[in-house]
């Protein structure tokens, strides 16, 4: 069974999805930023778990969510897909890292 917090129909999940949906093109947010925007500070890890469970056809802009150091948390093909999506939106990665001071949606 899934922890209540990360169940896709939980209040937490709906708040997280709304925060992710609010990230405009060309901007990014960290897992912690999303947790704070959703009203659940200190729940960044649960945000990561929820994002990892999104269905393949999700319309949420999952690629705009990064680690707190501005790096992509995904690996392999998924990391490459995320990098390509960010670059299509003119988000600059230098050394695999996005400057959150410049590109963050919520800071």
Could you say what each language-model-derived stretch is?
Residues 2-107:
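Nucleic acid-binding interface residues in structured DNA/RNA-binding domains
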């Amino acid at each position: 069974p899934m922890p209540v917090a990360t169940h896709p129909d939980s209040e937490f999940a709906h708040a997280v999805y709304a925060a992710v949906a609010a990230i405009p093109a060309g901007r990014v947010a960290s897992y912690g930023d999303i947790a704070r925007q959703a009203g659940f500070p200190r729940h960044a890890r649960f945000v990561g778990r929820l994002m990892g469970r999104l269905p393949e056809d999700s319309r949420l802009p999952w690629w705009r969510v990064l680690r707190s150091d501005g790096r992509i948390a995904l690996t392999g093909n998924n990391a490459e897909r995320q990098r390509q999506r960010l670059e299509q939106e003119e988000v600059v990665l230098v050394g695999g890292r996005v400057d959150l001071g410049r590109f963050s949606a919520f800071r």
